[in-house]
Design a protein with these regions (language model features):
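C-terminal/domain-edge helix-coil "capping" segments
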Residues: 96-133
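Surface-exposed short loop/turn segments
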Residues: 26-78, 83-100, 104
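A structural "domain/chain start" motif
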Residues: 1-28, 122-133
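Sec/Tat-exported extracytoplasmic proteins
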Residues: 22-27, 66-70, 112-125
Length: 133
């Protein structure tokens, strides 16, 4: 199992929740700890005639380090997740759209990290297969 250490903020919380689900939180004593730093940026992509943005791109960049419990770092990586969303004139709708964008970006980032770690673990096990007890 892998213990996931959550970065601060809403996107960090969502990312940790998705990774906990994917990596089997509580299934066994963790052999690794996954720590992450994330940067979230929002860029205007669609602009109305009055020069007000009505579409945004949300980019989530995650730098992660997988550390063996009781040891040092064994794997590092960087992934980038980008999604777009509409921004409505109504404040609540705009907030809901931004939160939906954060949710989709975190889900996409978690899938990318999960696949990266799965590929690394499979390669590691292929090089040094475990001896049955």
């Amino acid at each position: 199992a892998i213990e996931v250490v959550a970065p601060q903020g809403r996107s960090g919380f969502l990312l940790r929740e998705y990774l906990d689900d994917a990596l089997g939180r509580g299934a066994a004593a963790p052999a690794y700890r996954l720590t992450m730093n994330l940067a979230e940026n929002r860029y205007p992509r669609g602009v109305r005639v009055d020069n007000v943005a009505n579409r945004y791109e949300l980019v989530l960049v995650v730098d992660y380090t997988l550390t063996a419990v009781g040891g040092g770092p064994v794997k590092t990586g960087r992934i980038q997740s980008a999604v777009t969303y509409d921004s409505a004139d109504q404040p609540y709708a705009s907030i809901a759209a931004e939160q939906d964008g954060q949710d989709r970006a975190a889900a996409q980032a978690a899938r990318q990290i999960q696949l990266d770690l799965a590929a690394w673990l499979a390669k590691r096990d292929a090089v040094a297969p475990k001896v049955p007890a």
